[in-house]
UniProtKB/Swiss-Prot annotation:
One Pfam family of this chain: Steroid_dh
Protein name: Putative enoyl-CoA reductase
Molecular function as annotated in GO: oxidoreductase activity; oxidoreductase activity, acting on the CH-CH group of donors
GO BP annotations listed: very long-chain fatty acid biosynthetic process
Free-text disruption phenotype from the record: RNAi-mediated knockdown in tsetse fly procyclic form parasites results in growth defects in low-lipid medium and reduced fatty acid synthesis.
EC number: 1.3.1.-
Protein's gene: ENCR
């Protein structure tokens, strides 16, 4: 079949087999351009060409004919710009905080001056270790647990994500490793918060393993509604346990920078959770009976 590809003010006719998929179209049109940069849309049946919302993005999991593309159809091409792999973004953004904290902890004299450096107190040692363990866990999950439905994201996202994580890591690391750091007055609070953080990290890991098991592998875009005790109150317990872990860290260290990171994470994860919760409701209306991220609240 012949399909006309519209790109701005120009157009080009490409020939495809009748059972072609989106990948076939991407390979034929502008073959020198990376296929991950290419996006194609088709006008919904009866839609207005001047209405952007009337266009449907073609899905790589379905044949083009199943999505309304036939001989003589027109599709609209968009260059998504330079792309970078999802896994690469995660590895880089999580490696930064780990490297920053280790640099602070290993060479405090370079940061604070050799004349005022003193031995770390118990709380500092404990929470430096927990901070590093958290991001080591994230790196291991990125390599061995997470399965990404999309292969790439815009390259600019790696800068945005790194600025977020690395900036907070600079603030948290500077305060936690500082010779002027004052640990909480209650050793019980310090230890109880550390235990709580470990528990929440393990629960977060358990959720990630369950979610990973629901997908066949990278590129699998199916989103079945997760079930089980961890999902009994909220749709996204991984975000809940992530936030609770940082609440525990903040309580145990009593640092404003940590509370700032926790609050920023809460805002962002709440947005993601609400979006996922709404998608789950479309699949299973009974999901309305629970909240998105915070039990009984949100």
């Amino acid at each position: 079949m012949k399909v006309t590809v519209i790109s701005g003010s120009s157009s080009e006719v490409v020939e495809l087999p009748s059972n072609a998929g989106l990948t076939d179209l991407k390979k034929v049109y502008k073959p020198r351009v990376d296929i991950h940069r290419k996006s194609f849309k088709i006008l919904r049946s009866g839609g207005d060409k001047n209405d952007k919302s009337a266009y449907i993005t073609l899905d790589a999991k379905r044949a083009l004919t199943e999505q309304g593309v036939k001989d003589g159809s027109e599709v609209v091409y968009k260059d998504l710009g330079p792309q970078v792999g999802y896994r690469t973004v995660f590895v880089v953004e999580y490696a930064g905080p780990l490297a920053i904290m280790l640099a602070y902890a290993a060479r405090p004299s370079f940061i604070y001056g050799s004349s005022i450096v003193k031995e770390y107190c118990y709380t500092q040692k404990l929470y430096i270790a927990l901070f590093c363990a958290h991001f080591i866990k994230r790196e291991l999950e990125t390599f061995f647990v997470h399965k990404f439905s999309h292969p790439t994201m815009p390259r600019r996202n790696i800068i945005k994500n790194c600025v977020y994580y690395w900036t907070f890591a600079l603030g948290i690391g500077y305060a936690l490793c500082s010779p002027y750091y004052t640990e909480p007055a209650s050793p019980t609070l310090v230890n109880a918060s550390a235990v709580a953080m470990v528990i929440f990290e393990l629960l977060n890991f358990a959720v990630h393993v369950q979610l990973s098991g629901m997908r066949k592998g990278d590129g699998d875009a199916t989103r079945p509604v997760p079930k089980g005790i961890l999902f009994s109150l909220v749709s996204c317990p991984n975000y809940l346990f992530e936030i609770l872990s940082w609440v525990a860290f903040s309580l145990g260290t009593s640092m404003l920078t940590s509370w700032g990171f926790t609050f920023a994470g809460l805002v962002q994860m709440a947005e993601w959770a609400v979006k996922k919760h709404k998608n789950y409701i479309k699949t299973d209306p009974s999901v309305r009976n629970k909240k998105a991220m915070l039990p009984f609240l949100l």
